[in-house]
Design a protein with these regions (language model features):
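Extracellular calcium-associated, cysteine-rich motifs in secreted modular proteins
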Residues: 1-202
Length: 202
């Protein structure tokens, strides 16, 4: 029952002292007003209170409620490093690529082998959120495509089964079954290709 001066004796479902017709939150005893009409109460003394009482907003992440959130990802613009990208909000390594990594596989023609195809990734976000010098991994092997980096460099960015090339002869060091053109002489540079023996002196 409401105890407010002009509505004493009227229904007050949450018993906060504000009658239901005047209570913006009739079932919440800790909230009753919503100045900006964004659905977050003006009482900031509770965790769910509106942190931007006079400004409409829908943020709810990182403990900041009811503040402007242009991309509607839940993160207030002031906390969002990508305020216009709904998929991204953080960038741990500061390389300009968001930490949320998504990809879709796509099949393309293999330019090095006529009539063959390879599977590559169409990427969004940072494939290496903790390595500032790497962000892309188009073949999905866990090694980065940025050749100028000194960290986890993929010497074969289009070959999922190869990444290292110790002798720098263009043939990969991974010799497991099914690997692409494995180097039969991984510590000695070579150009051999006959009989599937790649990378030996010729």
């Amino acid at each position: 029952e409401s105890q407010a001066e002009l509505s004493r004796g009227c229904p007050d479902s949450d018993l906060d002292g504000v009658t239901d017709p005047l209570d913006a939150f009739p079932s919440d005893p800790f909230q009753w007003a919503d100045s900006d009409g964004d659905g977050f109460g003006d009482n900031t003394n509770v965790p769910s209170g509106d942190d931007c009482v006079d400004v409409f907003g829908k943020s709810f992440e990182e403990g900041r409620h009811g503040c402007p959130d242009a991309d509607l990802d839940g993160y207030a613009d002031v906390d969002d490093l990508f305020p216009e990208d709904q998929e991204q909000w953080a960038d741990f390594d500061g390389d300009g690529w968001g930490d949320n990594y998504f990809w879709e596989n796509t099949t393309v023609a293999d330019d090095d082998n006529l009539g063959m195809f390879i599977t590559l990734r169409e990427q969004r976000g940072d494939a290496f959120p903790e390595i500032a010098s790497q962000w892309s991994d188009i073949d999905g092997d866990g090694w980065g495509d940025n050749q100028s980096s000194s960290n986890r460099v993929d010497n074969f960015p289009l070959r999922v089964s190869q990444w290292n090339d110790f002798d720098a002869d263009g043939f990969g060091d991974n010799a497991v079954a099914g690997a692409y053109q494995p180097d039969a002489c991984p510590k000695v540079p070579g150009t051999s290709t006959a009989n599937d023996e790649f990378g030996c002196p010729d």
